[in-house]
Amino acid sequence: MAHWREEYAAALAARDRREKANVAIYNAYSQLADRTASSMIAVSDLQSDAQRSALSTPVADPRQQQPSPASGPSPQDIILAIRADLAEAQRSRSELEEQLARVTTELEKLRRRNIQNGKRISSMESEITHLQLRLKDRDEELREKAKLLEGFQDEIATFELQLNMAEERSNRLQKENQELIDRWMARMGKEADAMNDAYQFS
C-alpha cells in the first residue's frame, strides 16, 4: 500500500516542479519577446534617421573634406550591433521555444500518466477492498470449520474410549465364559467318571 502511495506523491511533486519551471520559461519568453520588439523598433528608427541624414546632407567636395576626429560609433555601427543583438535574441528565443515545447510535451505526458495512475489506484483500491472482504469471509469459514473439526475429533475420542471399554468388557466376558465352560466340562468329566466307576462295581 505504502509503495504506490509514495510513487503517486512523487509524481505529483514532479508535476508541481515542472509547472513551476514552465512559469519561469513563460516569463523569460515574454521578456524576450518584448526585448525583440523593442530592438526591431530601434533598428527601424535608426534606419529612418540614417536615410534622412543621407538625403539632407549636401555632397561635399572631396578636396575640401578634412579628416574629422572620431565622435563615437556611426549609425551604421549601431545598426549592426543592434542586428547582432537581435540575431542573438532570436536564437535565444528559438531555444526557449524548443525548451517550452519539450517541457510542455513532458507535462502533458505526466498529466496523462497521472490520470492513468489515478484510475489504476482507484481500481487497485476497489480490488483491495474486495479481497479484504473475501479474506474476512475465508477467516470466518476457517473458524467454523475449525470448530467443526474440533467437535468431530472430540466425538472420535469419545467413541474410541467407548470402543476400548467395550473391547475390555468383551474380553473379560469371554474369559469368564471360558472359565465357566472349563469348570462345567471338568464337572461333567468327574460325573462321567463316577458313573463309569459305579457301573463297573455294580
UniProtKB/Swiss-Prot annotation:
* Pfam families assigned to the protein according to its UniProt record, in alphabetical order: ATG16
The record's region (Disordered) falls at: 52-76
Q: Which GO terms describe its cellular component?
A: phagophore assembly site membrane
Topology relative to the lipid bilayer, per the entry, is: Peripheral membrane protein
Coiled-coil residues = 78-186
**Major place of localization?**
membrane
Q: Name one GO biological process term.
A: autophagy
Per its UniProt record, what CDD domains does this chain match?
A: Atg16_CCD
Report the subcellular localization.
Preautophagosomal structure membrane
Bias kind Low complexity: ranges:
64-76
Alphabetized, the UniProt keywords read: Autophagy, Coiled coil, Membrane, Protein transport, Transport
Subunit text: Homodimer. Part of the atg5-atg12/atg16 complex. Several units of each may be present in this complex.
Q: Which family does it belong to?
A: Belongs to the ATG16 family.
Function, as annotated, reads: Stabilizes the atg5-atg12 conjugate which is necessary for autophagy. The atg5-atg12/atg16 complex is required for efficient promotion of ATG8-conjugation to phosphatidylethanolamine and ATG8 localization to the pre-autophagosomal structure (PAS). Also recruits ATG3 to the PAS. Involved in endoplasmic reticulum-specific autophagic process and is essential for the survival of cells subjected to severe ER stress.
The protein's name in its UniProt record: Autophagy protein 16
Q: Which organism is it from?
A: Emericella nidulans (strain FGSC A4 / ATCC 38163 / CBS 112.46 / NRRL 194 / M139)
